Amino acid sequence: MSAKVWVLGDAVVDLLPESDGRLLPCPGGAPANVAVGIARLGGTSGFIGRVGDDPFGALMQRTLLTEGVDITYLKQDEWHRTSTVLVDLNDQGERSFTFMVRPSADLFLETTDLPCWRHGEWLHLCSIALSAEPSRTSAFTAMTAIRHAGGFVSFDPNIREDLWQDEHLLRLCLRQALQLADVVKLSEEEWRLISGKTQNDRDICALAKEYEIAMLLVTKGAEGVVVCYRGQVHHFAGMSVNCVDSTGAGDAFVAGLLTGLSSTGLSTDEREMRRIIDLAQRCGALAVTAKGAMTALPCRQELESEK
């Protein structure tokens, strides 16, 4: 039986442009996407965060509940609005984001909103939760507490630089998060920002060793992913698909990764690690073939039919 994966952060309504100029509201937000992705793959997930006492907040609560995510620790905030993001897609399906609500309800997460952690559980989060107080303190408290309880931390920076007014603070928060994380997924851009170096096997291993990261992954889009695990670097080629919308690819990848790791733990051998990365890659590849982030997340049946 797989361990529970708690996901902390923002539950967002993405506004996607339609061909007729209208905006289509879609449930999203990287943490919420990961929680739903895990549930669709047959894992056990719970969401920790805040939404506004507004129609978009109600939409996110209904969506997560319908998808089988535990929302016991998703709180309604009557004073702040649900995070809302305008997503713009270019001709290649690549996206840019405009945050319409600042500060949004998710950034007011308190330490009293956190659950009691259990041995073997996982916590996953992104850097948006670190971008403002009191969410920053709550996120670091959660990371520290779950490790003390014998659990594991997964961190995907998913950096949105326009949410950070102070680059020095961003770097400090990233370093602290890396020190607390067991598993870290970086994009190529995030790798360059954090390491300041070109990407090669030696530098990837050095960063993993510096922060004592058990599994460090650098995703390269269509080119695949590089994984440093137990001091060894492994290269996985990308999967060829027709990209319609890349919005949820990274979140689908993480959902597949954590679904696998929550079943095996971090003591898995190389063969099992390769199986988990294959699952994560197939999830990411399927997610780009449909429009939307959460709507495109694959379920277990889709993956089985692709074999």
Curated annotation (Swiss-Prot):
Source superkingdom: Bacteria
NCBIfam families per UniProt: PRK09434.1
Keyword check for Glycoprotein: no
Transcription found in the keyword field: no
Catalytic activity: D-fructose + ATP = D-fructose 6-phosphate + ADP + H(+)
Name of the protein in question: Fructokinase
EC id: 2.7.1.4
CDD domains per the UniProt record, alphabetical: bac_FRK
InterPro entries in UniProt: Carboh/pur_kinase_PfkB_CS, PfkB_Carbo_kinase, PfkB_dom, Ribo/fructo_kinase, Ribokinase-like
GO biological process, one term: fructose metabolic process
Family membership: Belongs to the carbohydrate kinase PfkB family.
Keywords linked to the UniProt accession: ATP-binding, Carbohydrate metabolism, Kinase, Nucleotide-binding, Transferase
SUPFAM superfamilies reported in the protein's UniProt record: Ribokinase-like (SSF53613)
One of the record's GO molecular function terms: fructokinase activity
